[in-house]
C-alpha cells in the first residue's frame, strides 16, 4: 500500500482491486498479491523522474472511468493521475460508491474527483511558490466535457447534477480547465483497468516512471 500511494502509480489499480476483499480474502486474492509482489521485484529500480522546466511546468490531471468495471457490484472504477514537471505527483484508483447508469455518468463522477484533487494541488503549489497557471483536467469523453463547459441544465443528467455543477463551477471560476484527450494518451487508463505490458509501459512513461 505504501508503494502504491508513494512512488508506484502503475500498481494502483491492482492494489485497489485486491484491497476490496481484505475482510474476506480467498485463494485468488493471495495469487493476485503474489503477482503484484513479483512485478515489483522485477521492476525494483523503477521510480518517478521529474524534469522541471523553467516557466514551463504545467499541472495536468488525467481523469478516467471504466464503466461497470467491477463485475461483482456493477460499479465503475475512477482513475486519476496528476502530473507536474513531467512526473506524477498525485494519483488514485478507487471503485465508485454507486452504480453509474452510463459511461458519461461514470466519467462525470471521475471528473468531479479529479477537480477536487487538482484544486487542492493548485493551492498547495501556490503555498510553496507562486502558481498562477490554470491547471488542466484531460478527459477522453466528449459528453462529460460538454457537461463541464455547458451552462444549460440537462434533465437526463439530473441525478448527477451536483457532480457536474461542481466541475462546471470550478471551470467558470477559472480554477481549472478541461481538455479532450485521445484514449491512446489517457494516462489515467492505467488506473481503471488491467492493461497488457506494452500499453502499461507506454502510460508509465507519460507518468514519468522510469
Question: Residue locations for each model-derived region?
Answer:
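Beta-strand-rich binding-surface signature
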Residues: 1, 10, 45, 59-60, ...
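RNase H-like nuclease fold core
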Residues: 61-104
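RNase H-like nuclease module associated with reverse transcription
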Residues: 21, 58, 94-210
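C-terminal reverse transcriptase regions that engage the nucleic-acid substrate
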Residues: 1-48, 182, 190-192
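Structured nucleic-acid-interacting core domains from mobile-element enzymes and related host factors
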Residues: 39-63, 129-131
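Beta-strand cores of modular interaction/reader domains in eukaryotic scaffold and signaling proteins
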Residues: 12, 49, 83, 138, ...
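Conserved pre-motif C helix in the palm subdomain of viral-like polymerases
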Residues: 1-12, 66-69, 77, 104-120
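Eukaryotic intrinsically disordered and solvent-exposed regulatory patches
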Residues: 35, 44-47, 66-69, 97, ...
Amino acid at each position: 500500500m505504501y508503494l502504491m500511494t508513494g512512488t508506484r502509480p502503475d500498481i494502483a489499480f491492482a492494489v485497489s482491486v485486491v484491497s476490496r476483499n481484505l475482510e474476506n480474502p480467498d485463494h485468488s486474492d493471495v495469487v493476485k498479491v503474489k503477482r503484484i509482489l513479483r512485478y515489483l521485484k522485477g521492476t525494483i529500480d523503477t521510480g518517478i523522474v521529474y524534469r522541471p522546466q523553467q516557466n514551463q511546468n504545467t499541472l495536468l490531471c488525467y481523469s478516467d472511468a471504466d464503466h461497470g468495471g467491477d463485475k461483482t457490484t456493477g460499479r465503475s472504477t475512477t482513475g486519476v493521475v496528476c502530473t507536474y514537471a513531467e512526473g506524477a505527483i498525485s494519483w488514485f484508483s478507487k471503485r465508485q460508491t454507486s452504480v453509474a447508469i452510463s459511461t458519461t455518468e461514470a466519467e462525470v463522477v471521475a471528473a468531479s474527483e479529479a477537480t477536487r484533487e487538482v484544486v487542492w494541488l493548485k493551492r498547495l503549489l501556490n503555498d510553496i511558490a507562486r502558481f498562477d497557471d490554470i491547471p488542466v483536467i484531460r478527459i477522453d469523453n466528449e459528453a462529460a466535457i460538454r457537461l463541464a463547459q455547458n451552462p444549460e441544465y440537462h434533465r437526463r443528467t439530473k441525478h448527477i447534477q451536483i457532480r457536474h455543477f461542481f466541475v462546471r463551477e470550478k471551470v467558470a471560476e477559472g480554477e481549472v480547465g478541461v481538455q479532450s484527450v485521445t484514449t491512446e494518451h489517457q494516462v489515467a487508463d492505467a488506473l481503471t483497468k488491467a492493461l497488457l505490458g506494452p500499453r502499461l509501459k507506454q502510460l508509465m512513461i507519460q507518468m514519468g516512471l522510469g
